[in-house]
């Protein structure tokens, strides 16, 4: 399949579209700024309360007449541009495919050679997030502002979290082979000028986010303007890039516990012990992009294995080459111990995105300029990106669309096929956006017999109003039909002579319903959950005890307790914190107007990550290895991102 790299089939239509949008944009921008000036966020309200001279109100009163005059002057040009823009949308393609062409063999092509479908299994990491990159006036309805700056910061945080150096912990003690849950922290020392991660001698040091330079020793802000300096994607999966931490049984005696003093008097939250402010996170320095000093390091980074006694005379862990195994090999070792023995996989609230993130699905990337900024930042890690997904005008749907679908997909692996469908059954405000589903087929490897190993991913955003359960169920029905059609239309295999082997089938996105509200019973019992497994769900209306909500209470986004990834992580690990800062379903029979009656559960989990256990290659199975609720985007969105790591094991792997 030929992927679309431009929104229009020829340069003439593209040029005409640029001219028409240039005529519309001044009016669009003025309307957005004018409306935004009358919708303050809680952060701005606090600033105004501390402003005795009321300078902000004075500026608003001064500039409002100017904006109105400019708006009236721009209306004729906007009308003329609209006359050209609207009919052009019938020729517009449903997405834009972006790939960094100068990758050569350093990017996705090299990843395809890592797994041949034999021997040890292969893990794949998926993440989904609603980032609320709406026009600024609309984002303020959700208590968010400064969409352009947030887009850049979101991209930097995701890139820095996914590109973290891989950390492997080995225990020299023959008796103590476990690490306490409190010691799951970022156990890396600052990298040297050559970008090589240094082993930590003696004691273990927590590293704050400002000390981490994720892109080969460069500061994340150094390439904010023009994207990555070298143009190469970050590859954190090679053993040479691993940061080795050895805990000696003779010297250390035991692993560090949560209450152990930290060298230098550094605060336990990894923030250097400084005072916490209420400044929004997207106004911080580029280096403050998600704490690496969190006690919630991903298990992909913190691989636990037992080291032998044959340490080299130099005492350097890097000298023992036998320790540099691939993560998938070490994680399947019999000596591996889970943090949650009562669960088939690990789960956590993490302060940053998982290391070695392979696939990213985002929702509500509506603003075009914000989408471009976000894409440029994500290209520092992901080689393949689909953005500006959706339709405009009256194309594809019965009602006029002012916004696209808001979906964005990023991948480290090559994309083979793409399909997009717009939901026709929408109403109210959702009818103005072309919300739908994006279906992708990616290649993740090849067998020695030249059979392609592929995976299927679907990203969607369902109808938002909570009372419209019937509309969401209809969209879930369409989603299932489109999933089956996409698998059928893109499959080139036959049962007798398969050309492709399916490794995984994942569905994710913002479903806008939860599994604990009595008002969402219709969606909770949908047949989609019989074909795809939800790792957080026990059954309709019944969540696993560790699952938490992914929708934040927008009134508390800028509170000191949750304004940083570390702080939000600590809050969400306690039941009281979840009750205060997560959104909970409200009962229709609430006795007092405006009062929330908190129901069972740990908040509204409306962001889902599902995977199929059937329809894969025979003798292969995909099992959840870890599941994470991520706080790295605190202050930048009103949703918690979620991530899932799947281990795809072949029949040749030992049980």
Curated annotation (Swiss-Prot):
Mg(2+) binds at residue 364. Its cofactor is Mg(2+). The gene is SMPD3. Residues 212-222, 248-257 have a biased composition (Basic and acidic residues). The record marks 512 as: Important for substrate recognition. Residues 1-10, 32-64, 86-655 are cytoplasmic. The lineage of its organism: Eukaryota, Metazoa, Chordata, Craniata, Vertebrata. InterPro entries: Endo/exonu/phosph_ase_sf, Endo/exonuclease/phosphatase, Sph/SMPD2-like, Sphingomyelinase/PLipase_C. Catalyzes the hydrolysis of sphingomyelin to form ceramide and phosphocholine. Ceramide mediates numerous cellular functions, such as apoptosis and growth arrest, and is capable of regulating these 2 cellular events independently. Also hydrolyzes sphingosylphosphocholine. Regulates the cell cycle by acting as a growth suppressor in confluent cells. Probably acts as a regulator of postnatal development and participates in bone and dentin mineralization. Residues 279-299 have a biased composition (Polar residues). This is Sphingomyelin phosphodiesterase 3. It is an enzyme of class 3 (hydrolase). Palmitoylated, palmitoylation-deficient proteins are targeted for lysosomal degradation. Inhibited by nSMase inhibitor GW4869. Binding of anionic phospholipids (APLs) such as phosphatidylserine (PS) and phosphatidic acid (PA) increases enzymatic activity. Residues 11-31, 65-85 dip into the membrane without crossing it. SUPFAM superfamilies: DNase I-like (SSF56219). The active site is at residue 639. A lipid is attached at residues 53-54, 59, 397-398 (S-palmitoyl cysteine).
């Amino acid at each position: 399949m030929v992927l679309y790299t431009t929104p229009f089939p020829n340069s003439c239509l593209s040029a005409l579209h640029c001219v028409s949008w240039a005529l519309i944009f001044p009016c669009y921008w003025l309307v957005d700024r004018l409306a935004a000036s009358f919708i303050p966020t809680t952060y701005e309200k606090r600033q105004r309360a501390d402003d005795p001279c009321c300078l902000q109100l004075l500026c608003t009163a001064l500039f409002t007449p100017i904006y109105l005059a400019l708006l009236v002057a721009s209306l004729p040009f906007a009308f003329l541009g609209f006359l050209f823009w609207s009919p052009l949308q019938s020729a517009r393609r449903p997405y834009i495919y972006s790939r960094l062409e100068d990758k050569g063999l350093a990017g996705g092509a090299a990843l395809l050679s890592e797994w041949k479908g034999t021997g040890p299994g292969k893990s794949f990491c998926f993440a989904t997030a609603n980032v609320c990159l709406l026009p600024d006036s609309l984002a303020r309805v959700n208590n968010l502002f400064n969409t352009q700056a947030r887009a850049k910061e979101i991209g930097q945080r995701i890139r820095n979290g996914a590109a973290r150096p891989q950390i492997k912990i080995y225990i020299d003690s023959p008796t103590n082979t476990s690490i306490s849950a409190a010691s799951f922290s970022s156990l890396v020392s600052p990298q040297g000028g050559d970008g090589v991660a240094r082993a930590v001698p003696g004691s273990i040091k927590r590293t704050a986010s400002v000390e981490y330079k994720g892109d080969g020793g460069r500061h994340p802000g150094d390439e904010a303007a023009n994207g990555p300096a070298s143009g190469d994607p970050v590859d954190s999966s090679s053993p040479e890039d691993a940061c080795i931490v050895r805990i000696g049984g003779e010297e250390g005696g035991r692993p560090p516990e949560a209450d152990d003093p930290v060298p230098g008097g550094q605060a336990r939250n990894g923030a250097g012990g400084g005072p916490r402010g209420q400044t929004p996170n997207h106004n911080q320095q580029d280096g403050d992009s998600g704490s690496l000093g969190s006690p919630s390091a991903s298990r992909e980074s913190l691989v636990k294995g037992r080291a032998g006694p044959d340490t080299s005379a130099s005492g350097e862990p890097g000298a023992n080459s036998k320790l540099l195994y691939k993560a998938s090999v070490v994680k399947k070792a019999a000596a591996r111990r889970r943090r949650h023995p009562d669960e088939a996989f690990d789960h956590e609230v993490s302060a940053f995105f998982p290391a070695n993130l392979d696939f990213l699905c985002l929702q509500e990337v509506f603003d075009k300029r914000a989408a471009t900024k976000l894409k440029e930042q994500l290209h520092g890690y992901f080689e393949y990106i689909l953005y500006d997904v959706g339709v405009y005008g009256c194309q594809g749907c019965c009602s006029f669309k002012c916004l696209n679908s808001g979906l964005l997909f990023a991948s480290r692996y090559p994309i083979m096929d793409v399909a997009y469908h717009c939901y026709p059954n929408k109403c109210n405000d959702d009818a103005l956006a072309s919300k739908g589903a994006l279906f992708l087929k990616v290649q993740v490897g090849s067998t020695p017999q030249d059979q392609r190993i592929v995976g299927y991913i679907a990203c969607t955003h369902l109808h938002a109003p909570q009372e419209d359960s019937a509309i969401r169920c209809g969209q879930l029905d369409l989603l299932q039909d489109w999933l089956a059609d996409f698998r059928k239309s893109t499959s080139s295999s036959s049962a007798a002579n398969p050309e492709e082997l399916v490794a995984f089938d994942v569905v994710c996105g913002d479903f806008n319903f939860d599994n604990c509200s009595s008002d969402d019973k219709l969606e909770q019992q949908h047949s989609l959950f019989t074909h795809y497994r939800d790792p957080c769900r026990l059954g309709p209306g019944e969540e696993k005890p560790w699952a938490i909500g992914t929708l934040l209470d927008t009134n508390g986004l800028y509170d000191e307790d949750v304004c940083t990834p570390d702080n939000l992580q600590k809050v969400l690990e306690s039941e009281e914190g979840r009750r205060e800062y997560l959104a909970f379903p409200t009962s229709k029979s609430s006795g007092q107007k405006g009062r929330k009656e908190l129901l069972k559960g740990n908040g509204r989990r409306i962001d889902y990550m599902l995977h199929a256990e059937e329809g894969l290659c025979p003798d292969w199975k995909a099992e959840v290895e870890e599941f994470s609720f991520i706080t790295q985007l605190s202050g930048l969105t009103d949703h918690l991102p979620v991530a899932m790591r799947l281990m795809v094991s072949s029949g040749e792997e030992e049980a």
